[in-house]
């Protein structure tokens, strides 16, 4: 079998794709890089917004045409597969294999049968499963929990991924040991609400540490860098900020979604906190981590959002001064309370507000990134940038960074760089040695001769 996997959505989907891919390899499958090479195509889907659902529909339409011309098995997994909406799509486009987020380990059973296979149960065996580590990568994801116990009115995740189930700490640490042995230097702990780790359906689990203490455990493992996502403000405790401050491996980066700056909108979203409570968390974080890099999620145009509500979101952005933000127009998802009970705003209103928020974000990102010029940053470089004479990666604070290759630093690794230029979306620097001096840059070839039409410029 030649299998090709396509992933839409979040980092948890990326982790799940790796899990299923490793299962396929264990069954003897070859993983190929394109649909044309494959006789089995598996799509890992996202259902949080309408746009990725539309992409899946389009892709399945193309694959159905290919099925009419050659032997091809088509599978769909992930959040959309768990929904009636996704199951209707699967029927329409003649999908052969359908796996929900809780039935990923059924992939072998699905491929053994000669008829259509649907696996949509939430199975306990998934939580103890430890996939083999990715090979040749410095970064890896590590799922510490699945599902969510919150019920935000706009969110389909509790339906698609089920109630929260925390993985046993022994399984987490065993998987971490495998990642370390494979050369991973940065791990991101994943969950819908990592701060609630160890408290499932409101009950503290015996033998499970708090998330703050899990951070301390992971930070003492020998891993070079630790990050985590996503956090819910309702469950963020000051002890998490304290654990970050006292654990050198944990990066000074917090992604804390706010969604709106208006208490009225937050109530309609059922977010369970107020603007004031959220700002108190920000103050706690900065008390322990004065140089913390802060990112957030914001939904624009939630049903009933007035111009006054939106102005409160803009003012919150200024009050916090985020380094980065993931900003989205509200997307009504069938099956959610907001879809059932609230009337949507006109598309043009939502789009105009999003443009104003993006302008605000660019202003703050430019200001924050400019402050990094002249500083020394630890950067994890993944590999070649668009111009192969440069390396790309990110700082401990998740800033995308580009540097020219230098003697002793021409490939992936963690290095130190002096930042010399910044844009709202990128830092540019030069690699330095332990003595603080610039490392000699490697000779550069003519970009045209190398076939590079858009070399990155260091300015």
Curated annotation (Swiss-Prot):
Q: Which SMART domains match?
A: Elp3
Q: How is the cofactor bound?
A: Binds 2 [4Fe-4S] clusters. One cluster is coordinated with 3 cysteines and an exchangeable S-adenosyl-L-methionine.
Instruction: Indicate what this protein is called per its UniProt record.
Output: tRNA-2-methylthio-N(6)-dimethylallyladenosine synthase
Cofactor(s) the protein requires to work: [4Fe-4S] cluster
**Keyword S-adenosyl-L-methionine on this protein?**
yes
List GO terms (cellular component aspect). Answer: cytosol
Q: List its EC numbers.
A: 2.8.4.3
Supply the alphabetized keyword list: 4Fe-4S, Cytoplasm, Iron, Iron-sulfur, Metal-binding, S-adenosyl-L-methionine, Transferase, tRNA processing
Broadest EC class? Answer: transferase
Q: Which reaction does it catalyse?
A: N(6)-dimethylallyladenosine(37) in tRNA + (sulfur carrier)-SH + AH2 + 2 S-adenosyl-L-methionine = 2-methylsulfanyl-N(6)-dimethylallyladenosine(37) in tRNA + (sulfur carrier)-H + 5'-deoxyadenosine + L-methionine + A + S-adenosyl-L-homocysteine + 2 H(+)
């Amino acid at each position: 079998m030649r299998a090709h996997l396509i992933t839409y959505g979040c980092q948890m989907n990326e982790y799940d794709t790796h899990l299923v891919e490793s299962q396929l390899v264990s069954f003897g499958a070859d993983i190929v890089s394109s649909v044309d090479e494959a006789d089995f195509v598996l799509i890992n889907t996202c259902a949080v917004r309408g746009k990725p659902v539309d992409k899946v529909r389009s892709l399945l339409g193309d694959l159905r045409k290919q099925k009419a011309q050659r032997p091809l098995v088509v599978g769909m997994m992930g959040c959309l597969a768990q929904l009636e909406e996704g199951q209707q799509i699967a029927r329409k486009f003649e999908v052969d294999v359908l796996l929900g987020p809780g039935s990923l380990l059924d992939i072998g059973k699905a491929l053994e049968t000669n008829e259509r296979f649907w696996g949509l149960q939430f199975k306990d065996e998934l939580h103890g499963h430890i996939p083999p580590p990715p090979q040749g990568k410095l970064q890896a994801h590590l799922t510490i929990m699945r599902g969510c116990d919150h019920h935000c009115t706009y969110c389909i995740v509790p339906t698609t991924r089920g109630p929260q189930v925390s993985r046993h700490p022994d399984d987490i640490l065993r998987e971490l040991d495998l990642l370390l042995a494979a050369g991973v230097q940065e791990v991101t702990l994943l969950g819908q609400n990592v701060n609630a780790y160890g408290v499932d359906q409101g009950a503290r689990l015996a033998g499970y540490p708090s998330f703050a203490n899990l951070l301390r455990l992971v930070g003492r493992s020998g891993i070079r860098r630790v990050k985590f996502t996503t956090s819910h403000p309702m469950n963020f405790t000051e002890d998490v900020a304290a654990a970050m401050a006292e654990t050198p491996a944990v990066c000074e980066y917090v992604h804390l979604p706010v969604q709106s700056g208006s208490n009225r909108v937050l109530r309609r979203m059922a977010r369970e906190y107020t603007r004031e409570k959220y700002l108190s968390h920000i103050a706690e974080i900065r008390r322990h981590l004065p140089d913390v890099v802060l990112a957030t999620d914001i939904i624009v145009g939630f049903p009933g959002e007035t111009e006054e509500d939106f102005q409160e979101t803009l003012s919150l952005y200024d009050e916090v001064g985020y380094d980065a933000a993931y900003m989205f127009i509200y997307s009504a998802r069938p099956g959610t309370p907001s879809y059932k009970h609230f009337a949507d705003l006109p598309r043009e209103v939502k789009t105009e507000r999003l443009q104003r928020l993006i302008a605000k974000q660019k202003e703050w990102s430019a200001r924050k990134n400019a402050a990094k010029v002249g500083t020394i940053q630890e950067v994890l470089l993944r590999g070649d940038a668009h111009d192969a004479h440069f390396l790309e990666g990110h700082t401990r604070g998740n800033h995308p960074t580009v540097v020219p290759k230098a003697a002793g630093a021409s490939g992936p690794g963690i290095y130190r760089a002096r930042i010399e230029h910044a844009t709202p979306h990128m830092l540019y620097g030069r690699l330095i040695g332990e003595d603080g001096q610039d490392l000699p840059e490697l000779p550069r070839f003519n970009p045209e001769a190398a076939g590079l039409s858009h070399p990155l410029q260091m300015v």
